[in-house]
Amino acid sequence: MAPAPKLINWKRNLFVAWLGCFLTGAAFSLIMPFLPLYVETLGVTGHQALNMWSGLVFSITFLFSAIASPFWGGLADRRGRKLMLLRSALGMSIVMLLMGMAQNIWQFLALRAVLGLLGGFIPNANALIATQVPRNRSGWALGTLSTGGVSGALIGPLIGGLLADQYGLRPVFYITAGVLLTCFVLTLLYVKEQFTPVQKKDMLHARQVFAALKSPKLILSLFVTTMIIQIATGSIAPILTLYVRDLAGDIHNLAFVSGLIASVPGVAALMSAPRLGKLGDRIGPERILVFMLIVSVLLLIPMAFVQTPWQLGVLRFLLGAADGALLPAVQTLLIYNCTNQVAGRIFSYNQSFRDIGNVSGPLMGAAVSASYGFRAVFCVTALVVLFNAVYSWWCLQRRPTRMREDTLQEE
């Protein structure tokens, strides 16, 4: 018989998982500043072709991740989450190494697709911690864990740009592979999991997974919420620099100001996520989720009417503070309303919806701005988030009032 789960030092696992998410977030964002430049070195010429290929190599990773996530989630429920962390870190390390050796754009595109197939360190880390931490500490733990990937993604572009200037483009891929290999070694040595493998014949099928849930409709609504959160975040990304230029006029440090305004939401999320997660443990993650969605709407609307970049920067900082609570609240509600037996698949389905949002958001933002202008993007995004707030509130109201208390008592 497996040892009692209480023997797991979940706080140490949380620390190592946070470090792994930080390294993974940094590794992925290391290459982002010069991705179009690398595409150009692979033989792509012309403004239109460069834009098309840059968009393809960026989005194909998310598309293939959305396809592969449910498979890896099922394997996590059968073989354990630590194995999935190791598989993801090592697989991504090898692919990053090969990316640095790519000789043409087709090889690079194929490797970006494989990267999506083999990814998933952060969602698997979320599933591992969510199934180990005491339920009454879930909000704080998942909020804290979310800061790992965010902080890595914030520092990655800065370091990646410096490394590319110093050593060239290809060596950055080799350095990134080394970072991911470090993540693999740390996970192998220090993450502990007590998991009894499940035979394939004993596994629940996808339909049975949802039938076994306390509230399948609620879980589906949380998936949709995750997708809309990513759509709202991504819709602004394609037009942000151009919007800042419209607000600022001809300034010599446009790239710096745009980068600063792009990064302030992440800084705010770092500060707010653990605190709001802890508050959610006290008052309920459902209240945090709905309230912060409404706050996001109230911050998005005035962004359409700002007159200076600094006004936009302040509003985006406040928006980041609100957004920092959203995904941890969703993940906490997911673990409240599913069993450990199916947690891997539930989190993987959620990751698929997140990837769909990552692809759809920039497309929506680009389409709206092309037709109606930059300011309309913020209004349309606010409407989408408002729908999400109302939809989430409605679904959470239909949940049995004792559901959360019953889930807590199971621990």
From Swiss-Prot:
Q: Where in the cell is it found?
A: Cell inner membrane
Primary site of residence = membrane
The superkingdom listed in its UniProt entry is Bacteria
Read off the SUPFAM superfamilies from this record: MFS general substrate transporter
**Membrane-related topology note:** Multi-pass membrane protein
What's a Pfam family this protein contains?
A: Sugar_tr
- The answer, when asked if Acyltransferase is one of the entry's keywords, is no
The GO terms describing molecular function are: transmembrane transporter activity
Cellular component per GO, a single term: plasma membrane
Q: Where are the transmembrane segments?
A: 14-34, 56-76, 89-109, 113-133, 144-164, 171-191, 219-239, 254-274, 288-308, 376-396
Alphabetically list the UniProt keywords: Cell inner membrane, Cell membrane, Membrane, Transmembrane, Transmembrane helix, Transport
UniProt xrefs under InterPro entries:
MFS (IPR011701), MFS_dom (IPR020846), MFS_MdtG_subfamily (IPR050497), MFS_sugar_transport-like (IPR005828), MFS_trans_sf (IPR036259), Mutidrug-R_MdtG (IPR023692), Tet-R_TetA/multi-R_MdtG-like (IPR001958)
Regarding protein family, the annotation reads: Belongs to the major facilitator superfamily. DHA1 family. MdtG (TC 2.A.1.2.20) subfamily.
Q: What's the protein name?
A: Multidrug resistance protein MdtG
Species assigned in the record: Serratia proteamaculans (strain 568)
Q: Which gene encodes it?
A: mdtG
